[in-house]
Regions:
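A short, contiguous, amphipathic alpha-helix enriched in charged residues
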Residues: 90-124, 207-219, 255-274, 377
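Conserved catalytic-loop position in the HRD/HxD motif
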Residues: 280, 285-287
Length: 379
């Protein structure tokens, strides 16, 4: 595509704002270059002609880590995509072509310098896992402990920053031609993506999350997370206890090892309610690739994306849950209205809202969790 493409020049003009923190060297030239790359990849996959689930996954992988993250989220949203697409996108949770081991060692040397061999007695060249953001290798400290090293992929932070900054610019510029209310939510979503990006790509934050999660759940005998070696962590490297176990999504293997799937689901839901309602500090990305079962315990192994709730928000969730338990549509409506960020009573058909809630409670109010199709519920 030509450099003077009218659309690209309009959206990514020289006066466009760069990233707010000014950390990634983003500018109109880098935006246009990346946008041409995105358009080229979409064109290569002939997306406008439609695609199979496999082609859609492959396109997201080619587009890079930001789009892989979006695909991971979509894999759990059967109310948005057909089931066959969701099933294919689950591969994005655990599968990604690994980088050469030499590149990972170079990244470690950049962080530790000549200390790497003083810290690690051995590092397995075969990765335990390779995701869009980072690669994990098993290692042994010189002190003898078995650990997992999470190493951020070189250059991935700058690419993700550029992608999200492009999304921000598109949303902001396009809003000039649309009603403000139509774009408000989209712009808020992009800003939330930026905040999540900053948190997930700074492994010092994940180290702090691991320590806080362990402390808050210390009395829960069936939930755990890896021990973190804070003094060995940095923005780009996380060192934590190596935890072996069965992925929570591997139902056949869990059953073969004597686990009760209903019991696991019940315990996980119980603890998740505790995280939200009591702690106000909860795992915000609990997809199957982030949770394993070891010795009867539910182990969260990736705490890069955590959420926090104020006391007011926790109380609001409690009111919603109580109303569902009582199968009271009026109380549920009031609880949802109190919890909403914005309330425009004039824009709400209260009678229809109550009728819809009544049907919702009739369908789901007395269901076991295992009986609920979450995607269908949300739709």
């Amino acid at each position: 595509m030509a450099e003077n493409n009218t659309l690209l020049r309009h959206f990514f003009a020289p006066g466009a704002d760069a990233d707010p923190e000014g950390r990634f060297g983003l500018n109109s030239k880098s935006r246009r270059r990346r946008m041409r790359e995105i358009i080229g990849i979409v064109g290569k996959h002939r997306a406008l002609e439609g695609f199979t689930p496999e082609e859609f996954r492959a396109m997201l992988e080619d587009l890079g880590p930001s789009f892989v993250k979006i695909g991971q989220t979509l894999s759990t949203r059967s109310e948005i995509l057909p089931k066959v697409f969701c099933e294919e996108l689950t591969k994005l949770q655990t599968e990604c072509d690994p980088l050469p081991f030499d590149e990972m060692l170079a990244a470690l040397d950049k962080e530790f310098g000549g200390r790497r061999k003083e810290i690690f007695a051995e590092i397995d060249s075969k990765p335990l896992g390779s995701a869009s953001l980072a690669q994990v290798h098993r290692a042994v400290l010189t002190s003898g402990e078995s650990v997992a090293i999470k190493i951020q992929r070189p250059g991935v932070k700058a690419t993700m920053a550029l992608d999200i900054d492009i999304m921000r610019t598109l949303a902001r510029r396009a809003s000039r031609y649309m009603k403000g209310e139509q774009m408000l939510d989209l712009r808020a979503v992009v800003e939330e993506m930026w905040a999540t990006f900053l948190e997930e790509t700074d492994f010092r934050r994940e180290a702090a999350n691991l320590a806080e999660f362990a402390e808050l759940n210390r009395d829960c005998v069936f939930v755990a997370c890896p021990k973190v070696y804070t003094d060995l962590c940095s923005e780009f490297v996380l060192v934590m206890e190596y935890v072996d176990g069965i992925p929570i999504g591997d139902a056949d293997r869990l059953v073969a090892n004597g686990y009760d799937l209903e019991e696991i689901g019940s315990k996980m839901l119980d603890n998740y309610a505790t995280q939200i309602l009591d702690h106000g500090f909860f795992h915000a990305d609990p997809h199957p690739g982030n949770v394993i079962i070891r010795d009867g315990r539910i182990v969260y192994i990736d705490l890069g994306n955590m959420g926090r709730l104020s006391a007011r928000d926790r109380a609001g969730f409690g009111d919603i849950i109580e109303a569902v338990g009582l199968k009271d549509p009026g109380a549920l409506k009031d609880a949802l209205m109190r919890f909403a960020a914005k309330k425009d009573n004039a824009a709400i058909d209260h009678a229809r809202f109550l009728a819809d809630l009544d049907l919702l409670l009739e369908d789901y109010g007395s269901c076991d969790v295992a009986e609920i199709d979450v995607g269908q519920f949300l739709s």
